[in-house]
Amino acid sequence: MAEEFDFHPMWESLGMNLADHDMLLGAVGQMYGDMFLTQNNRPKSTSYLDFVATNIHSGRIKEMLDKKEAGEATKIVGSFCVYVPEEIVLACDGIPVGLCSGADWATDKVEEHLPRNTCPLIKSFAGFKLGEVCPYIESSDLVVGENTCDGKKKAYEFFATQKNMYVMDIPNVHDESTLVTWKAEVKKLAAKIEDECGVKITPERLKAAIHAVNEKRRALQRLAATRAADPAPISGLDSLLTVQAAFMDDTPRLTGAINDMAAECEQRVEAGEGVAPKGTKRILYTGTPMAVPNWKLFNLIEKAGGIVVGEESCTGSRYYKDLVDESGETVDEMLDAIAERYFKINCAVFTPNDQRMKDIVQMAKDLHADGIVDVALQFCTLYEMESFAVEKAAEEAGIPFVHITTDYAGEDAGQLQTRIEAFLETI
């Protein structure tokens, strides 16, 4: 679609900076070609990922806007976090989408509103808005934020001057009393989405939405399970993009495509076919989430001769590992089930966060990882501080560990390559 249609009038109607957006698309397209299309022996079904990459700012945006115009969808609801329940948006015939936050943009403008020593992800979403180059932000009727880290919490105060904004209050402790608070917060969000979309959530609507998102999670779980094999049937780069796509693409289409990928990878496992030779050093990634087009670290690991076999992150297992209980019959029961499922996400914002350490070690064992690469974006205090606990858990489990602090720029690629190559040689 992107190659057959001129999308510039659509982007212009969204108030975007066309020249800068063209420059961004050119850079991301070049990056995608250099990183993804140069991989050897990719599964044929990853052609879906090429489709996503080609249409991410064009065909998908047109599809969403066309659905709104045709009355098939009510509102486009953007978010930056896996704690925002997409089931609620779908139950109101809305379209949930993840928003741009994976590259540096308009940094000079951003630093007129946010401190220079703010994490790259936060500066990125502010920059994409101020630079008018993200069609997901521009097409969103509502942006749902969440007070996870302090940086986001305060940045949303600025972002609310730019977009229609609603911020969820997420507890920072896992216990029975905070779960009660969180359930009430989820119900407040449901009321807000109902009001924005002009649709009343019924048991039938919510049950269908829960099932649809659970099916997406099941497909991602199925694909992830194949990565325990040696040789790995699919690269870490392609696996990362499947989850990144899950934030943006149409849910039924993505679910079908991921199931196709999983089926092909299952066949590859049976045949002993992989994207890297048997015995390639296997890496578990853990740490900060990676939004499109932040593929730098996975590319470096796999170009250095390793293979990423799992991601303990919000653009990895935390997104899909738990399902919502589908046994509820009333809206309240189902909203409680949604809240309970999302409350299991072990973000570094929680204290204490012992379950995350257990998850990391268990994933490393289940996926037969040879080492753990723990990553924090620069100035991300939460993941930087929690890295010490991750290192201790890895050491106690006898799993080699390295911690990396990086940002979205490419200037540190050489240094990171040297560190990654040295780490792979030691395991």
Predicted segments with their positions:
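Acidic/His-rich segments in extracytoplasmic proteins that coordinate ligands and/or metal ions
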Residues: 128-192
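Glycine-rich, highly charged phosphate/nucleotide-binding loops
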Residues: 117-132, 348-362
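Redox- and metal-dependent alpha/beta enzyme cores, enriched for Fe-S-associated oxidoreductases
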Residues: 71, 82-83, 88-102, 109-110, ...
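Structural motif
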Residues: 76, 141-142, 371
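A charged, amphipathic alpha-helical module
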Residues: 2-3, 8-75, 187, 191-320, ...
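Short, acidic/turn-prone active-site loops that include or flank metal/cofactor-
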Residues: 100-106, 169-174, 312-316, 406-408
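Short hydrophobic segments within beta-strands
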Residues: 80, 284-286, 375
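TerminUS-proximal long segments
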Residues: 356-427
